[in-house]
Amino acid sequence: MKSIFVAGTDTDVGKTYITAGLAVALRKMNVDVGVMKPFAAGTAQKKGFKSEDVEILAKAAQVADPENLINPQFFPIPASPYTAWKNLKTKPKVSTILSSFKKLSKLHEMILVEGMGGIMTPILKDYYITNLIKEMKIPSVIVTRSKVGTVNHTIMTIQMCQKYKIPIKGIIINDFDDDGYPIKNLKRDLESLTGVKVLGSIPFIKDMSNASLNRIFKKNIDLKSLLK
């Protein structure tokens, strides 16, 4: 079973919550799912995982894998790997990321890899998230918003994936609300303009318990298409 890279059209589109929800729902389908966030950044937590996002993923997937495999590199400032490298003099370790991914892949049937920022977030000079996905040799799922402007961002993200020959499993629309693009119209337009299937849309989630995530994702996401 192929692992999947959960990519976003931008930062803060909800990649962590989508990855967590997918992990919970797939586990309920008896898929042995592992999780990974190659790069994380921000203020380190005092207890548990350094990254809150990584902790959310590990709890959702109910894994006890070492932190250095789930999150091989953490930067203590909110910045891209490239900017963190320039500011902190800590170079992103792509070889370590790829090695950790291979090790995790031997421990689980499938790995959900959460990206960082958008698809062209820089890791090194002339090396972006797209390059990393390409080296991992896995397909992607694109997480996008429902707000006005999302069509532009989603099309650009998909075109970059296509340029790098990254297979796309589908699009997930996250956190839809009444003030955004009407979901039915957005789904129609995205599929018509990109030729990529919209796997579903997720409303704002207040209850992040595994039971709640499973219920919401089972109801709203085409999980069978995701696993094809």
Swiss-Prot record:
GO terms for cellular component: cytosol. It holds the Pfam family AAA_26. This is ATP-dependent dethiobiotin synthetase BioD. Homodimer. Mg(2+) binds at T16, D53, E114. It catalyses: (7R,8S)-7,8-diammoniononanoate + CO2 + ATP = (4R,5S)-dethiobiotin + ADP + phosphate + 3 H(+). Keywords: ATP-binding, Biotin biosynthesis, Cytoplasm, Ligase, Magnesium, Metal-binding, Nucleotide-binding. HAMAP family: BioD. Its cofactor is Mg(2+). CDD domains: DTBS. NCBIfam families: bioD. Belongs to the dethiobiotin synthetase family. It is an enzyme of class 6 (ligase). Its EC number is 6.3.3.3. InterPro entries: DTB_synth_BioD (IPR004472), P-loop_NTPase (IPR027417). GO terms for molecular function: ATP binding; dethiobiotin synthase activity; magnesium ion binding.
